[in-house]
Amino acid sequence: MSDVKLTFLGQDFVYKKNETNWEVHLKRSDVATQDMNRLLLLNLHHPMFLEQSMSFDDDTVQFNYELEEDGLNLATIKARSLSEQLRLALNVLDLEQCLQLPVTFFLHPENLFITKDERVKIAYRAVPDIMVPASIDSEEFLKQAKCYIIAIFTEHPFSSLYEGALDVIEVPEFLDNIRKLSSVEDVRESLTAYYREKCEQESASLTIVKKSRYKLYKYASIWL
C-alpha cells in the first residue's frame, strides 16, 4: 500500500492506496460537527462515485473506497495517444452533473479513479459547510476541470495549476484556447471537435501503417 499526501484548500489529505482499495484519513477536527450521522449521506450510490464505507474514532475519520478491476492512472493515460487523452478530458467534464448532488468534491488527480475504459469516478466527497471543500459551484468546477485537463497534456501538476499557475504558464495553442473559455459547455465543444480531428488523423495513420506492413509482407513472401 502506498501513501499519497496532498493539500487542498489548506487541508491535508492522506490517501493509502493499493490495487483494490483506497483509504482517506482525516483528523476528527477536520469535520466541523460532533454528529457523525451527518456524514452518512457520503455513502451515496452513484455511477460517478466510488463505493464508500466509513469508520471513525475520537481522533480520526477513515473513508474506504472500493476500486474496479484494471483501473488506470493519469501517468498511463499521458503515455497513450492524444485521442485517448482527449477522451479522458471529456469524461472529466461529465462530472459536472455531480454538482446537482448534496455533496461537495474536488478534481485533484489523486482523488479521481480512472476505470479501464477511461470513465472517471470520484473518491473523497464532503458534506457542505462542515468539511473541505465547503462548497463547489459551476465556476469552481470549471477552474478545477481546466487544471486537470492541462495536467493531462503537460508536466504541470494539478496543485500548482490550481494555486495560480493556470493563468500564467505557457501552453500549446489548443490548451490556451481551453484556458480562455468561460463555461464547461464551451470547453466540451472545443475538446470534442479536437477529439474528432485527432481520431481521424490517427485512423488515417493506422491505415497507412497497415498498408505498409502488408506491402512489406507481400514482398518478403516473394523473396522467401
Feature map (PLM): residue ranges:
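Membrane-anchoring helices that localize proteins to membranes
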Residues: L216-L224
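C-lobe/activation-segment region of protein kinase-like
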Residues: L6, L101-V103, T115-Y217
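Hydrophobic HxD+1 residue recognition
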Residues: L107
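Protein kinase catalytic-loop region centered on the HRD/HxD motif
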Residues: L93-P102
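Short, hydrophobic/amphipathic alpha-helical packing segments
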Residues: L86-D94
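Conserved structural core of kinase catalytic domains
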Residues: G10-R87
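Hydrophobic residue at the +6 position relative to the catalytic HRD Asp in the kinase catalytic loop
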Residues: E110-L112
